[in-house]
Amino acid sequence: MELKGTKTEQNLMTAFAGESQARNKYTYFASKARKEGFEQIAAIFEETAANEKEHAKLWFKELCGGESPDTAANLEAAAEGENFEWTDMYAEFAKTAKEEGFARLAYLFEAVGKIEKAHEERYRKLLENVKDGKVFIADDVVIWQCTNCGHIHVGKEAPKVCPVCAHPQAYFQRVANNY
């Protein structure tokens, strides 16, 4: 049976959005509870947020035909989403806020729009690396670090297996010294 265009598809999208928003709210609520000295309540909010994440994942998978798309497709979808946010959504929100006299909110919408543009660029570069087989291979010698144990390797390619902790190449990333 075809899901596309049905009321059930709309319900799945609503359920996914609702569970996603609940997860974020509960995470924020946990932070506030912790700041106010309520560790148990914070932990319960965090536990519930984790449950909501799993509910959202369930509905997302159903919307995707039962399985999440591969990383290349996810990077493309993420880039497209970020593009919409900075070119359309936040630009329109900023315009409306200005027209209605909310200068601070207009500024924030514009500022977040710039961040979303950077997100799009990052996703597009990562997608290019995936397509070109350059996630773990560089044209020049670079510094690679195992994100599990911290092992440093210098070379054009990340090790297939970390020589210290035996984690696979997937745990290596290029080091960006920003200090």
Show where each model-derived region lies.
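Non-heme di-metal
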Residues: M1-Y179
